[in-house]
């Protein structure tokens, strides 16, 4: 596979290989058959990052081969959304003749939405000045005149210049309801929108008929907690990154949801608060004891859950665990299976043609 050529004819084979690998990993835990969710075979990534290569008068996007570290020119990128592909060529063509915009530009990051909005972040190895901003505003206006609903951002060491705003608002149809999600530049968002919708709908399905409240750790911009709010009386969610918390608060208001409370703190600190180990100022006014959380939702980083958090989640009757790394999920399951059994298992092909797997498990307390 090269960046410009996806092995589309191998899509079914690679998905079957992942399914078999997941079954093998899950075999010690008497898991049910995985529910398998397919990705679009191309144009599935809503984000992409490219280095920029300068060769005399030429300038183009590049990526590096993961094995050989060789430089690969990328003029089209079928893994990314069609909108990203269109902007890639238009942006390079517009920047190339402009020395002020070209000089020491080393990377471009793209973030697009299904709703037709896109952010391009231009990263430089130099300080950006008023002259750069004037040229960037002209560039933005020219590209908007070509039909791009574009936000343009300049970045350099300890510098960030927003010409307008640093976010786009995405709209995802989730189980019959349009959900609005503010996505902030340089913050985590799910890269594969089609699979994100399927993950949200699967999470809704497995929590249908839930009793009590939901606790979520690592909630990001509220991706799961807002979609799941309709299945629970109340949702209490934690997130450490400030921009993500701000986006989550906006998303709560935009979706007119009144039963979600977001707390800005690390999952490890929240574990201490729940266990009564110590008190935190940012929890003032929130009565944790008033929540009746029968279900806990976790979507941890690749490293999985730390030992203390694993112990904490074992106290809940139901655990919904979304994992971007089945190996660390299995390490956590070694402990979780002592108290819980897996009732649902899903494979989400977020990253086709790579070894990466996203999966979900619903664990229910053993009687």
Curated annotation (Swiss-Prot):
HAMAP family xrefs: RNA_methyltr_TrmA (MF_01011)
Active site (UniProt): 324 (nucleophile), 358 (proton acceptor)
Catalytic reactions of this protein: uridine(54) in tRNA + S-adenosyl-L-methionine = 5-methyluridine(54) in tRNA + S-adenosyl-L-homocysteine + H(+); uridine(341) in tmRNA + S-adenosyl-L-methionine = 5-methyluridine(341) in tmRNA + S-adenosyl-L-homocysteine + H(+)
One GO MF term attached to the UniProt entry: tRNA (uracil(54)-C5)-methyltransferase activity, S-adenosyl methionine-dependent
Pfam families xrefs: tRNA_U5-meth_tr
Family stated for the protein in its record: Belongs to the class I-like SAM-binding methyltransferase superfamily. RNA M5U methyltransferase family. TrmA subfamily.
Binding residues annotated for S-adenosyl-L-methionine, in chain numbering: 190, 218, 223, 239, 299
Known function: Dual-specificity methyltransferase that catalyzes the formation of 5-methyluridine at position 54 (m5U54) in all tRNAs, and that of position 341 (m5U341) in tmRNA (transfer-mRNA).
Alphabetical list of NCBIfam families matching this protein: trmA_only (TIGR02143)
GO biological process: tRNA methylation
GO cellular component, one term: cytosol
EC numbers, comma separated: 2.1.1.-, 2.1.1.35
InterPro entries the UniProt entry points to: MeTrfase_TrmA_AS, MeTrfase_TrmA_CS, SAM-dependent_MTases_sf, TrmA_MeTrfase, U5_MeTrfase_fam
Protein name: tRNA/tmRNA (uracil-C(5))-methyltransferase
Organism: Serratia proteamaculans (strain 568)
Keyword terms: Methyltransferase, S-adenosyl-L-methionine, Transferase, tRNA processing
